[in-house]
């Protein structure tokens, strides 16, 4: 499964059209869209701020689980010194970019569901729009709780898909199925977290992202950068993807 994920994302995340849409920022997530948000990069930065607001005292160390190309890690440097920040990912190609985006941070090739850290290693953990890929969320949550220090906080955003969508994805994805925010909260508690605050941000993140993405594609078509067939195919693909996201939880879980 990891090889399949890398094959897709190592191509998509370096595609010229995708990079243009994300403002060459190296973010690749839905972002948080408020009234007045104009660009995807701005929305991605707003999502980071929304998640980090769950951590009022930004102290100690923080782990960026599934850090992608390091844009999320770079944003953490607004609040943490580089030596306090660790990023992990399963793609060495993306980690090479991450090291350039967030110099001084520690980056390690590592599976988020099999953390190779000692117990109580971090004060905080963040994971942005990645846990639906993990094998599985439950394993990741248990591992996250293990490596957090007492009183530590896990913050994340995630996509909860329909059962139909999970069935057509790679084998094993149904083992990672979570029905709704209530089920997510129960999963956090069973992993060892004492409580979990959850906001369902499907409208603010996934739905508004889709509108912005299609608007961008139409603009590129009018400019002659892509043809109408490409516009139709990409718009249909993105619409199907978002239509099958039932919930987009923002989660803050705290270890006792």
Q: Could you describe each region identified by the protein language model?
A:
Residues 156-176:
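Short, glycine-/aromatic-enriched active-site segment of Class I SAM-dependent methyltransferases
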Residues 200-256:
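Conserved Class I S-adenosyl-L-methionine
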Residues 63-65, 69-114:
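Class I SAM-dependent methyltransferase SAM/SAH-binding core
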Residues 113-125:
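A short acidic, Gly/Pro-enriched loop at the edge of an enzyme's catalytic core
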Residues 41-58:
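Conserved alpha-helix/loop element of class I SAM-dependent methyltransferases that forms part
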Residues 1-32:
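N-terminal, positively charged/glycine-rich alpha-helical extensions of SAM-dependent methyltransferases
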Residues 138-153:
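A short glycine-rich, Lys/Arg-flanked "PGG" loop and its adjoining helix->strand segment in the class I
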Residues 176-192:
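Short alpha-helix
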């Amino acid at each position: 499964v990891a090889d399949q994920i890398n094959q897709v994302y190592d191509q998509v995340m370096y595609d010229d059209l995708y990079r243009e849409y994300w403002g060459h920022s190296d973010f690749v997530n839905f972002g948080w869209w408020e009234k007045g948000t104009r660009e995807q990069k701005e929305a991605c930065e707003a999502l980071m701020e929304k998640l980090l607001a769950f951590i009022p005292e930004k102290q100690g160390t923080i782990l960026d689980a599934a850090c992608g190309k390091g844009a999320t890690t770079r944003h953490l440097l607004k609040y943490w010194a580089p030596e306090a920040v660790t990023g992990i990912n399963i793609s060495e190609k993306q980690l090479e970019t991450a090291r350039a985006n967030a110099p001084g941070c520690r980056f390690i090739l590592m599976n988020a569901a099999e953390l190779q850290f000692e117990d109580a290693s971090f004060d905080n953990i963040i994971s942005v729009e990645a846990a639906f890929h993990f094998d599985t969320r439950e394993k990741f949550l248990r591992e996250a709780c293990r490596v957090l220090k007492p009183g530590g906080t896990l913050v994340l955003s995630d996509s909860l898909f329909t059962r139909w969508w999970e069935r057509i994805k790679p084998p094993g994805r149904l083992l990672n199925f979570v029905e709704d925010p209530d089920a997510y909260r129960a999963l956090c508690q069973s992993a060892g977290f004492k409580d979990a605050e959850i906001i369902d941000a499907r409208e603010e993140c996934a739905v508004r992202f889709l509108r912005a993405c299609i608007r961008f594609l139409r603009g590129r078509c009018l400019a002659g950068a892509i043809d109408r067939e490409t516009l139709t195919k990409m718009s249909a693909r993105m619409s199907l993807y978002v239509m099958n996201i039932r919930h987009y939880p923002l989660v803050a879980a705290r270890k006792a």
